[in-house]
Amino acid sequence: GCHVNGLVAHENGSQPDSLWVARRARTKPTYPGKLDHLVAGGLGHGEQPGENVLKECAEEASIPREVAIQARPASIVQCCKADETRWGVKQETLFCYDLLLPCDFKPVAADGEVESFELWEIPQVIDSLAADNDDWKPNVALVIIDMLIRRGFLAPEDDGYVELVRALRR
């Protein structure tokens, strides 16, 4: 699937300091009410990640195409998840994009999959992930941790950094 980190830098030209966070609709059959990316969606057979990002940006958060085309491929995260329908484990490849959004941008849920959007400061995101309280959709947490490492919000001096990077890159 494709995941978009919707980032905001409140000082022009600076490192982003905030991340848009979605709360999934409580009516969703999978991970209802969990915290999620601004935009994320499954990748259909033969569908290109970049086109999927543009489609999902419009469908999930009403992001205009002229803004969505600024999403940049940033990383790939691979993980496994339990798959009850196939009696085992499913390998996931997550295409990670970063999208720097204007300070005055406000996402609007367009497809009923999102209950609300909130703009969180990066330290709040880190604290929430570190609390390990099951608030986040699991694969979303992995993609956000990847972004925090890539952008230097987490550093080798932080407790558990090496173990975290090692686990993420397995």
Task: State the predicted function of each range.
Residues T27, Y31, A82-E84, K90-R170:
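Nudix hydrolase/Nudix homology domain
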Residues G1-Q15:
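Acidic, metal-coordinating catalytic segment for phosphate/diphosphate chemistry
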Residues V4, C57, Y97:
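Terminal peptide-recognition signature
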Residues E66-A74, P107-D111:
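Short acidic alpha-helical/loop segments enriched in Asp/Glu that coordinate divalent cations
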